[in-house]
Amino acid sequence: MLLKGTPVAERILEKLKQKISQSPTPPGLAVVLIGNDPASEVYVGMKVKKAMNLGMVSKAHRLPSDATLTDILKLIERLNNDPTIHGILVQIPLPKHLDSNVIIQAISPEKDVDGLHPVNMGKLLLGQLGGFSPCTPAAVIELLNYYDIPLQGRHVAVVGRSNIVGKPLAAMLMQKHPTTNATVTLLHSQSQNFTEILKTADIIVAAVGVPLFIQENMISPNAVIVDVGISRVATNNDKGYMLVGDVDFNNVVTKCKAITPVPGGVGPMTVAMLMKNTWESYQKSSS
């Protein structure tokens, strides 16, 4: 079974669009782009366009790659104090001379719709309400819930321990809640008996950032696979490349129980979760 994210994301976005159309003022999303990374340009443009299509006010704030930390913090402070802005997103990766932790911590937790501020991460780990969940981990859980794939009591192997996906996803999956409550193993490059552990997993979430890393001999026949990765791999087609995930889809798809495609799986859901967080921030500011 294919776990397609696009139709699920479209349903979420359509509901948001209806709610926004009935609101007295539009939610505002500010996207900060530092430098001229081509992939980041595409992602920022897509997020701004999606927000505007929903009826939000959205703008990309571009700074040069040699922007100083002072310049960036001044911009974030201005956005923090702007009552028409309800969500602030700093596009990652950043130029090497910048510390992403300092920049993320400068964002008001109430406007941190990416869910990466330490305050929101802390609430997530403690299972407290009121914070924002990181968009990609939230997308993974939303997608599994939509397709009625139970998590409670199941063994979920998360491959990758990044602050953006792996760590927060593990924390969310283990929460004592009817939609999660899973037994979680977090695997990484130093994990011993990697394949043996992976084969015991009911659900595998691949978020390691290595193209085609998960092979068919590493999974059990009844595993559900969620592929978070997306990479460009050079090919001889007209584009000169193709998009692939962290899972060797063509060989794994015939063996596993269900799998997300790349593209069209987790990606659209991540954007939908960003818009959902922005709407929730708007609601909180209006109450």
From Swiss-Prot:
Keywords: Amino-acid biosynthesis, Histidine biosynthesis, Hydrolase, Methionine biosynthesis, Multifunctional enzyme, NADP, One-carbon metabolism, Oxidoreductase, Purine biosynthesis. GO terms for biological process: L-histidine biosynthetic process; methionine biosynthetic process; purine nucleotide biosynthetic process; tetrahydrofolate interconversion. Its EC number is 1.5.1.5, 3.5.4.9. Homodimer. Pfam families: THF_DHG_CYH (PF00763), THF_DHG_CYH_C (PF02882). It comes from Chlamydia felis (strain Fe/C-56). Catalyzes the oxidation of 5,10-methylenetetrahydrofolate to 5,10-methenyltetrahydrofolate and then the hydrolysis of 5,10-methenyltetrahydrofolate to 10-formyltetrahydrofolate. Pathway: One-carbon metabolism; tetrahydrofolate interconversion. GO terms for cellular component: cytosol. NADP(+) binds at G160, R161, S162, S189, I230. GO terms for molecular function: methenyltetrahydrofolate cyclohydrolase activity; methylenetetrahydrofolate dehydrogenase (NADP+) activity. It catalyses: (6R)-5,10-methylene-5,6,7,8-tetrahydrofolate + NADP(+) = (6R)-5,10-methenyltetrahydrofolate + NADPH; (6R)-5,10-methenyltetrahydrofolate + H2O = (6R)-10-formyltetrahydrofolate + H(+). Belongs to the tetrahydrofolate dehydrogenase/cyclohydrolase family. The keyword Isomerase does not apply. It comes from the Bacteria. This is Bifunctional protein FolD.
